[in-house]
Amino acid sequence: MSKRKRPEELRSHRWLGVSDLRAFGHRARLRQGGFDDADFSGKPVIAIINTWSDINFCHTHLRDRAEDVKRGVMQAGGFPVELPAMSLAEPFVKPSTMLYRNLLAMETEELLRSHPIDGAVLMGGCDKTTPALVMGAISMGLPAIYVPAGPQLRGNWRGQQLGSGSDAWKYWDEKRAGRISDAEWAELEGGIARSFGTCMVMGTAATMMAITEALGMALPGASSIPAADAAHPRMCAAAGRRIVDMVWDDLVPQKLLTPAAFDNVIRVHMAMGGSTNAIIHVVAMARRAGIKLDMNRFDEISQEIPVLANVRPSGQFLMEDFFYAGGSRALMAELSSALNLSCLTVTGKSIGENIAGAEVYKPEVIHPLSDPVSREGATAVLTGNLAPRGCVMKPSAADKRFLRHRGKVIAFDDYNHMAREVERDDLDVTPDHILVLKNGGPKGGPGMPEWGMLPIPKKLLKQGVCDTLRISDARMSGTSYGACILHVAPESFVGGPLAFVRTGDEIELDVPARRIHLHVAEEEIARRRAAWKQPAPRYPRGYGALYLQHIGQADEGCDFDFLAAPGTISEPEIH
């Protein structure tokens, strides 16, 4: 570890430690808040970036947990300041939280840049919050540690364990098919989300919390602690203590984020059976760190690493069970032969040291490499004339008969068109048809909404059909499942081949060969392209207009072009 900083080398010293009029004003304002020299003089100023809000129930507890972080910071001799940031509540933010991920990343970076901050504790968990916080922290380059919100408790309905998201989709289809009543549906509504915390299946929230720990940005085991468990506030206090030492040691993200660390992330993602959304976020995070990472690397590792976590939607159990089985440390220990164990983490130790001694207590929940949940990798990346820059699928959550399939297309121009058609009892559809949704991508959605798990047509549900092949340039919730081809790039809105697919065309999918092909002659595709007109942009002004002008495609991580690479970290002048 490098030589420890002296107090006068702290970034906050420029604001608080010098003898001039500006520093006088800064210190006077701190005294206005009831603080004196013993609170802040010569101490690291630690920002607690808190994404709590009244409408984000994944983060309800973060208001109190921030106090635990402050307790830890003060125990270690730091001065904590809580800075509220945008809270991306997945259920409530429309049209999509993905539209605002980069805005929160920008806010995080600028909060840290514009204030007298020496280090940061990043508090979040709900889906896009985690990558946004990490992306902003990477770009700012200050010591930072991530505090995951943690999963909620198991859902329950009439003695059955429920998984948020996954069972909502399942029982909604049952209701559409007429197999459960309105009264039963109302009971489900009251039992599927029983505590604060993130979705308790292996959705995007659980995936991103776990892989941020695997990246080395969180304390060992932190990502799998349930939000309501007493271990959670203890972890928060420990993170507060640790960030102070990280500041003195100048342990910045750039010292942790190496190509080997990102390979660890992808391996853990595959072993967890993680959300397809993570691919977009990890690519964006890597590029912020100056590491070129593309979807092909995910596919290479997917073919090496099987699924070990028997957690819904790819498995049977829930995140609470995963915690009792040993949690993230146990899974990484089981996977240790495939990990780069020398990678440095926020503890100042290697990931190998962090997972030493971890055990699997419930092998039915965390399987060994010798007996995985699925030998098929968690994610497959496909290319072909329909997706020249790639698309993704989660084979572990799909009906295996669709891994090789050729069928006729039913194409929908937008979400509303699709939503009307799938409810028709007279829709001309069979289980072999392929449903194609256009204009669900980064610009077309806009914000690449989670529309990719298209509803199974009601006509098929009534026949007992549980899965059908669906293709879109949208994303799907990590809690979703089924034979869904996602993230088709380039998207239809910008003239990608998906824009030219028509009802009656045939598409062929071969997941083992990693190919997807539209069986339409090149001449006909060219004719359709010439006749195509781009849809009108949704936003003429404001943040939406900025987003549409600068957003990248799915294979690029959907970052803004002016943020997607590291640059000189500018410091403000103090006048």
Q: PLM features: what roles do these ranges have?
A:
Residues Y100:
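Glycine-rich phosphate- or other oxyanion-binding loops that anchor nucleotides, phosphorylated ligands
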Residues R113-L133, A144-A149:
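A short, small-residue-rich loop immediately preceding and capping a beta-strand
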Residues L103-H115:
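Short, well-structured alpha-helical segments in soluble
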Residues S2-D54, C58, R65-M86, P91, ...:
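Catalytic or ion-coupling anion/metal-binding cores of large enzyme and transporter domains
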